[in-house]
Amino acid sequence: MAKIPTDNHIRSMLDSVHPSHLQSSFDQVVAALREKGGMNEFQRLGGRALIALDGTEYFCSYKLGCPHCLTRKRSNGKTEFYHSMLAATIVAPGHNMAVPLMPEFIAKQDGAEKQDCERNAAKRWLTTHCERVKALRPVYLGVSGILCKRLP
């Protein structure tokens, strides 16, 4: 390979791809694991899958921002631009691997006055993906307390 694209170039190419187009890739991984018995290693509590839901930031800058960025004011008075997501992952105690599921991005929502948050992303994830993972008989783990209160 003569020219290797930079991470910024790859990001700019992928920015136009809606995340929903990636859903089938996540589904195919889980389906292949189930078909070949790979999910058996992740079953706990009588054959249930543990799905951890936790927020994480994957971009942060004082200089670069986009229309989808969330913002926060720091104590130094500067505005910080960032992107975050709710990661959903099949996990098992004592297992050194995890199976990622489709994330839910924490971003400005159309018509909303307040910024999006991890708790709202968890509600959206559960609404969107509950049926999809139902066969795994999931137990949801709210890593940072997002499931401490009952979600509708």
What name fits each language-model region?
Residues 73-136:
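Electropositive, glycine- and tryptophan-enriched low-complexity nucleic-acid-binding patches
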Residues 11-95:
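Active-site-proximal, Lys/Arg-enriched surface segment
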Residues 6, 47-59, 88, 122, ...:
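Short, conserved catalytic/metal-binding motifs centered on acidic residues
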Residues 24-26, 134-138:
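Short, basic, glycine/proline-bearing loop/turn elements
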Residues 62-63, 148-152:
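A short acidic (Asp/Glu
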